[in-house]
Amino acid sequence: LVGSEMCKETDHHPANLFVADFVGNPSINFVEAKGKQAADGSLTLTVLGGLTARFRPAKALELSKWFADRDAAAAKKAADLKEKAAQKGYVEKGNKDEVFRYHIAKVDEEDDSLAELPEITNEDFVLGIRPEFLDIADEGNLRGEIYGAMPTGMESTIKVRVGGFLLTGVVFGSSLFTIGTEVPLSVTGDQIMLFDRKSGQCITSGTLNF
């Protein structure tokens, strides 16, 4: 897989969107993003209905090369498939390879299973944020509203509303949360995942700041 050196098959570095969704409890937060890479290697992204965020890869990344490698791998795969299809006795796969349709948690849920997919470009990404990396912090620049809270022993699983979107976080300690309270949020650590929306593959991991 393209980018496999940066995205190992572990909890925090899955190879693609499907694996990221499958691994972990509570489930990962998927956030659609749109943006470009700057000269310093970072990406300025528009997320969560219009907010601006800065993603910095943990390792050096040249996105244009990554996209070129992705396209070359896809072309080779298509050529190999065409060659196999020409062989006698070839049976086409019933489960054709398709990009995993991830779920975006929203306050007002919609059934988009039959919706037509928008045109995806190289400026379209998906961020993967594990709940343990969403923190309530006084210095946080992201504002959210407590939408739900479930104490589970030494930690609490919280649902936070940001605009029309819902994010899941895991907060350690015995704090009590009041529904509707506004809280400052930050995304911690350097294991925030950046996925290619076109292929579903993990590009790299890094930090995310608002």
Question: Where do the model's predicted regions map?
Answer:
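Short acidic-hydrophobic catalytic motif
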Residues: 8-12, 20
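Non-catalytic connector elements of ABC transporters
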Residues: 28, 39-210
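Short, small-residue-biased leader/transition segments that mark boundaries at the very start
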Residues: 1-7
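Elongated periplasmic alpha-helical coiled-coil
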Residues: 25-27, 34
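Internal, well-ordered alpha-helical scaffold/interface segments
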Residues: 17-20, 123
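Short glycine/serine/threonine-biased micro-segments
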Residues: 1, 22, 151
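Residues located in well-ordered beta-strands
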Residues: 18, 32-34, 143-145
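Phosphate-coordinating loops and pocket residues in cytosolic domains that bind phosphorylated ligands
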Residues: 3, 12-13, 24
